[in-house]
A protein has these predicted regions:
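Generic detection of short hydrophobic beta-strand segments and adjacent strand-loop junctions
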Residues: 51, 157, 201-203, 208-213, ...
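Secretory targeting and sorting signals
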Residues: 1-41
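Low-complexity, intrinsically disordered segments enriched in Ser/Thr together with acidic residues
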Residues: 161-218
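Beta-sandwich strand segments
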Residues: 98-102, 121-123, 228-270
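Internal, hydrophobic beta-strand segments that form the core of beta-sheet-rich folds
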Residues: 202-242
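Serine/threonine-rich, low-complexity linker/repeat segments that form flexible spacers/stalks
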Residues: 2, 6-7, 42-149, 171, ...
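Internal, charge-rich low-complexity segments
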Residues: 128-152, 226-251
């Protein structure tokens, strides 16, 4: 079971993802879920591939998936300016059946974003009304450290259901539901019935507020530093737990990193900047001097040359 998915064209979507690595595929839907953004924001969209490793009763299943992440951010900010950027993955899906297994749901979904350099973190929050097809624990954003523990000095922003994930957290499991869940609906993102029985969903956008530093650029990225850049690591930026029925309940904990395939060591563009916010140069104060040449004395009412 858990055979690699086969992509199938559909009228409403550009690509179809299959179980057991459902969260990292790209899906563009015409007119879907336009999100309000701050004035003067520049929209950056980055497409990239991820290599995913899904555990199963037959051993690890490897799959390459397509991804899309959008960032709405100001093109430039002033030194010391408080600003907000918005980041969100595209919609994706999982099938009704795959290789004899009947899917049940996905849960313990997680996306990790790196906190950018050259700015001071202020806050991060889920944007209400930007997710589709989720239930169980409401998505939230936690600042965590490399071990996945909540830490006010951590360098990672974790989108999850209260840190209930499959690994790299104090609240982990690979054989029980938890956190953000995607129940089977067999519906598209717009609520219409999907002809193939696929269940479409979308994780919410996150607004990140920061204060710009003195110089340089600010570049939002997914988490890839250290072990997060390894193939099939619990620290990977995107992880989730698939549940299916095949001779009993089966679980497929899945871990995805931005690389072209399982045999590729270097990370791809997905590990690079998803947007670039320039910090404008501070104005330079130039001292000026005005010299006046006048006679030492003058008669009242007389012109002075």
């Amino acid at each position: 079971m858990f055979a690699l998915p086969k992509e199938v064209p559909m009228p409403q979507i550009s690509q179809l993802r299959r179980f057991a690595v459902p969260i990292t595929g790209t899906a563009m839907v015409a007119g879907m879920l336009l999100i309000g953004t701050p004035a003067s924001a520049a929209i950056s969209t980055t497409g990239f591939k991820t290599a995913c490793v899904a555990g199963s009763i037959i051993g690890d299943v490897h799959k390459v998936t397509d991804n899309l992440i959008t960032v709405d951010a100001p093109a430039s900010v002033q030194p010391g300016e408080t600003f907000t950027y918005r980041i969100q993955p595209s919609g994706t899906s999982y099938p009704d059946k795959d290789s004899g297994a009947t899917t049940t749901n996905l849960s313990r979904l997680k996306v990790d974003y790196a906190i950018p350099a050259n700015a001071t973190f202020v806050s991060a929050a889920v944007v209400a009304g930007t997710s589709v097809g989720l239930d169980s624990v409401a998505p939230n954003v936690l600042r965590v450290n490399d071990s996945g523990n909540v830490d006010g000095s951590g360098g990672i922003l974790r989108l999850s259901g209260n840190n209930q994930v499959i690994g790299n957290s104090p609240t982990t499991s690979t054989n029980s539901e938890g956190g953000i869940r995607v129940p089977k609906s067999k519906k598209n993102l717009d609520g219409s019935t999907n002809g193939n029985g696929d269940t479409w969903f979308r994780l919410p956008a996150v607004d990140v507020t920061m204060v710009a530093g003195a110089t340089g650029v600010i570049q939002p990225k997914v988490r890839t530093a250290g072990t997060a850049g390894n193939l099939g690591a619990s620290e990977n930026f995107s992880t989730q737990l698939a549940k299916a029925s095949f001779l009993g309940t089966q679980w497929a904990p899945t871990r995805c990193s931005p690389r072209e395939n399982k045999d590729t060591t270097p990370l791809n563009a997905g590990a690079g900047p998803l947007a670039t916010i320039s910090i404008a140069s501070a104005p330079v104060d130039v001292e000026t001097t005005t010299s006046l040449s006048v006679p030492a004395t003058a008669i009242t009412g007389s012109a002075v040359d």
